[in-house]
């Protein structure tokens, strides 16, 4: 697979889909997300590690019941097996990119809405 070199912050800011996979290789995956105001990602736990970088908006991170605030430039690392959720608390969508290691979503995954993502859940 060729190297990936793009402005990830611009890609995340421009993304309007709830979830959009943009890169998957053998050991990692990059996914863009846009969470509408008042909505959340949905409580979940993965079998893989997850790193989230917040690009714009404001929100709340909930990891194993512990709550903290997130905003542009926040980084949250979610170890495999950690129960987590992220809530968009501002007036604009919470925009972020996330890195899974190893990959979590199928290559080419696009979920335009949270409902679409929930219908496709595999965990």
Regions found by a protein language model. Give the residues of each.
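Short, conserved beta-strand element in jelly-roll/cupin
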Residues: 34-36, 45-61, 99
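A generic "binding-loop/recognition-motif" signal
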Residues: 28, 37, 47, 66, ...
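Short, charged/polar surface micro-motifs in flexible loops or helix N-caps
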Residues: 26-28, 37-39, 58-60, 67, ...
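Short beta-strand His + acidic residue motifs that chelate non-heme Fe in jelly-roll/DSBH
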Residues: 41-43, 61-62, 78, 84-90
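Short histidine-centered beta-strand/loop micro-motifs
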Residues: 20-23, 33, 41-46, 87-89, ...
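A short, N-terminal "cap"/entry segment at the start of jelly-roll beta-barrel domains
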Residues: 1-27, 111-123
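Ligand-binding loop in jelly-roll beta-barrel domains
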Residues: 80-106
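Short acidic-glycine-tyrosine-enriched beta hairpin
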Residues: 66-80
């Amino acid at each position: 697979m060729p190297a990936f070199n793009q402005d990830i912050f611009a890609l995340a800011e421009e993304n309007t889909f709830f979830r959009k996979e943009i890169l998957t290789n053998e050991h990692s995956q990059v996914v863009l997300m846009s969470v509408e105001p008042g909505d959340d990602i949905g409580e979940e736990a993965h079998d893989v590690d997850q790193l989230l970088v917040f690009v714009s908006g404001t929100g709340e991170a909930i990891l194993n019941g512990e709550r903290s605030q997130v905003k542009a430039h926040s980084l949250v690392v979610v170890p495999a097996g950690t129960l987590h959720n992220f809530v968009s608390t501002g007036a604009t969508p919470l925009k972020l990119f996330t890195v899974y290691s190893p990959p979590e979503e199928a290559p080419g995954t696009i979920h335009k809405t949270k409902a679409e993502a929930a219908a496709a859940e595999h965990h």
